[in-house]
A protein has these predicted regions:
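Two-metal-ion RNase H-like nuclease active-site motif
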Residues: 47-67
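A short, polar/acidic, helix/strand-boundary loop motif
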Residues: 77-107, 115, 133, 138-150
């Protein structure tokens, strides 16, 4: 299955570790008690078994290393069916030279979000970014950076058809806690396959 060139690989139906399940339950608790309104705020807040978790990352151009893999990567965790999907897609050098890391992060996140909304309509989505600027922009659908406006417009177009059916909650996690998505964005897949 693909959306906008995004291809997902199914990692299979596997048990979540106790630590992963605890982390997801903590995220749900935080969402249920956070101040502010998520996208489609008239809908019920998500419960652990009634949502999908997306974790995004993008690796931009490394000045001292022009040869290593740089791309976008996302994990999709579905607690109800205990399925895990992953995607990773390399960025062409032209894109790496023209876009900064927050732009790449939002581009990757928007494509994965679009895929999840189409594939699992009506299921609450919890997105996790390790980039604070990407998180803030995605939550508000607005930014102060002209370079990110195209991603906000794309995201609005993606979300609009789901306004009455699907809530999307976007949160920030410390970079050190997002290492799984970081490994995908750098194509470090050996330990997952």
């Amino acid at each position: 299955s693909s959306v906008g060139g995004l291809t997902l690989r199914k990692s299979g139906q596997v048990p979540f570790s106790y630590q992963a399940e605890d982390a997801f339950r903590t995220i749900i608790y935080a969402i249920q008690h956070e101040i502010g309104r998520p996208f489609a705020s008239d809908l019920a807040l998500p419960a652990y078994n009634d949502c999908i978790f997306l974790m995004h990352d993008a690796a931009g151009l490394a000045e001292d290393d022009l040869e290593s893999y740089r791309g976008g990567g996302s994990w999709i965790w579905i607690p109800a069916s205990r399925q895990i999907f992953m995607t990773t897609s390399g960025f062409p050098m032209s894109l790496l030279r023209s876009e900064h890391s927050t732009s790449l992060e939002l581009m990757n996140g928007n494509l994965t979000l679009e895929y999840a909304l189409r594939r699992w309509p009506g299921v609450a989505i919890v997105e996790i970014y390790d980039n604070q600027a990407a998180t803030a922009s995605a939550r508000r659908l607005a930014c102060h950076s002209d370079s990110l406006n195209k991603h906000m417009a794309y995201r609005r177009d993606v979300l609009l058809p789901y306004l009455r059916t699907t809530s999307v909650h976007t949160i920030w996690a410390q970079r050190e806690l997002g290492t799984l998505a970081d490994m995908l964005s750098k194509n470090e897949l050996a330990q997952f396959l």
